[in-house]
UniProtKB/Swiss-Prot annotation:
Membrane-spanning parts: none
Keyword terms of this UniProt record: DNA damage, DNA repair, Host nucleus, Hydrolase
Chain's gene name: UL114
Origin species: Human cytomegalovirus (strain AD169)
One GO-annotated biological process of the protein: base-excision repair, AP site formation via deaminated base removal
Main location per the UniProt record: host cell
Name of the protein this chain belongs to: Uracil-DNA glycosylase
EC numbers, comma separated: 3.2.2.27
Subcellular location: Host nucleus
SMART domains assigned to the protein according to its UniProt record, in alphabetical order: UDG, UreE_C
Keyword Methyltransferase tagged: no
Length: 250
């Protein structure tokens, strides 16, 4: 209730003051490369300004992760023209380890249970993969793996707490633009939230791989055994004559 009252009191009608691309990069903390690539329509810009304002309000009332400077690290580590694989998750870890990359943690933090299951699948299917001690996935991002959550912030200890703030305006637009403007990408959709994004992707131009979320709490289906990394590299080899190096330093 406190957050709702703050939003009503502080989020003004932004329709009369549209942002330039440079202003969008500053206000949304997105890289200039991604701002140019996304070409956000005016309506989405207005909605996203409201979302950013709501998150700023939430930070005044409770602990929100990741830190403001980390929310969109994905946009700085993985430029749009370098993307080869898109892994779509749900929202950040709510324990303070979130890094701005879906499933990844800050350097030096141990892998959470969900990421441990991802590493189990990698160890099963990728030659030479050694399970690292840290959950940092920055190396993947720099190689062209876009690690994208559908929701970019979360309240401490409350998974899914920011689903209602409108971050999907941005995450959906990222996926749609990549589908429209790039060719032969691999989209890995992990979990029910990620599956809702499938309609944004043109299957005639891209490979879409769906699986349950890697959380060990998922008791209905197994993530380990989905062969996503094998299938992704086979597709990349066909279209780019190269594969993704999934190994991470220990």
């Amino acid at each position: 209730m406190a957050l709702k009252q703050w939003m009503l009191a502080n989020i003004a009608d932004n329709k009369g003051s549209l942002l330039t691309p440079d202003e969008q990069a500053r206000v949304f903390c997105l890289s200039a490369d991604w701002i140019r690539f996304l070409s956000l329509p005016d309506h989405d810009t207005v909605l996203l300004r409201d979302t950013v304002a709501a998150v700023e309000g939430a930070r005044q009332l409770e602990m929100v992760y990741p830190a403001p400077e980390h929310v969109h690290r994905w946009s700085y580590l993985c430029p749009p023209e370098q993307v080869r694989v898109v892994i779509v998750g749900q929202d950040p870890y709510c324990d303070g380890s979130a890094s701005g990359l879906a499933f990844g943690t800050l350097a030096g933090r141990p892998p959470p249970p969900s990421l441990n299951n991802v590493f189990r699948e990698l160890a099963r299917t990728v030659d030479g993969f050694q399970r690292p001690a840290s959950g940092c996935l920055d190396a993947w991002a720099r190689r062209g793996v876009l690690l994208l959550n559908t929701v970019f912030t979360v309240v401490h200890g409350q998974p899914g707490s920011h689903r209602h703030l409108g971050w999907q305006t941005l995450s959906n637009h990222v996926i749609r633009r990549l589908s429209e403007r790039r060719e032969h990408l691999v989209f890995m959709l992990w979990g029910a939230d990620a599956h809702t994004c499938e309609y944004l992707i043109d299957r005639r131009r891209h490979l879409v791989l769906k699986s349950c979320h890697p959380s060990p709490r998922n008791t209905t289906r197994a993530f380990v055994g989905n062969d996503h990394f094998i299938l992704a590299n086979a597709y990349l080899d066909t279209h780019y004559r190269e594969t993704m190096d999934w190994r991470l330093c220990g």
